[in-house]
UniProtKB/Swiss-Prot annotation:
Gene Ontology BP annotations: L-tryptophan biosynthetic process
Keywords, in A-Z order: Amino-acid biosynthesis, Aromatic amino acid biosynthesis, Chloroplast, Glutamine amidotransferase, Lyase, Plastid, Tryptophan biosynthesis
Source organism per UniProt: Cyanidium caldarium
Descriptive protein name: Anthranilate synthase component 2
Record-listed L-glutamine binding positions: G52, P53, G54, Q83, S129, L130
Length: 195
């Protein structure tokens, strides 16, 4: 089963529809309705943390989900979800300059299972006012996170956990029409498994 955590974003419906077209075995829970201990009783194979408003530090339950499930369940954070994953592992967040609302950017990515079969650079939709701060560390965001995709200007568009190899964050929206290969990326993520 796929768990989609809905952070009250207007794009959540599009995300649920896109994922449901790939695999209809999914459950959608609002972030303020989640109890990590109850989630353990579900047969969760993948977790997707949706976009949403606000700052990632306001979503403590999502951080609890990431910390509990990341060692054995593939997790994909989208936009706010990406920032939640980054802050779970000590990356910092800063204001985006400029703010992006429905703009497409070229994304330059490293070779990774998440981007398998996706021709780089690819075009993706951006809707955000915050970004993960690169903090002059190159590809090493923190001791356990690395950058795997950026814009031409060097803004982080995707990160991945070094040890929990299927924990990813992406700043862009794969469910948007502006993201040319978004469905392929979601299929790639949903094909990942720890065993």
């Amino acid at each position: 089963m796929i768990l989609i955590i809905d952070n009250y974003d207007s794009f959540s419906y599009n995300l649920v529809q896109s994922v449901g077209e790939i695999n209809s075995d999914l459950i959608v829970l609002r972030s303020d309705e989640i109890d990590v201990s109850k989630l353990q009783n579900l047969n969760i194979k993948h977790i997707i943390i949706s976009p949403g408003p606000g700052h990632p530090d306001e979503y403590t339950i999502c951080k609890q989900v990431v910390k509990f499930f990341a060692p054995y369940t593939p997790i994909l954070g989208i936009c706010l979800g990406h920032q939640i994953i980054a802050t779970c592992y000590n990356a910092s967040i800063k204001k985006s300059s400029p703010v992006f609302h429905g703009r497409a950017s070229k994304i330059y990515c490293l070779k990774d299972k998440l981007f398998l079969g996706i021709h780089a650079p690819f075009t993706a939709a951006r809707y955000h006012s915050l970004v993960v701060d690169q903090d002059k560390r190159g590809l090493d965001l923190t001791t356990c996170l690395k950058t795997i995709a950026i814009t031409r200007e060097g803004v982080i568009m995707a990160c991945k956990h070094r040890y929990y190899h299927f924990t990813y964050g992406i700043q862009f929206h794969p469910e948007s029409m502006l993201t040319i290969q978004g469905t392929k990326l979601l299929k790639n993520f949903l094909s990942l498994s720890y065993g």
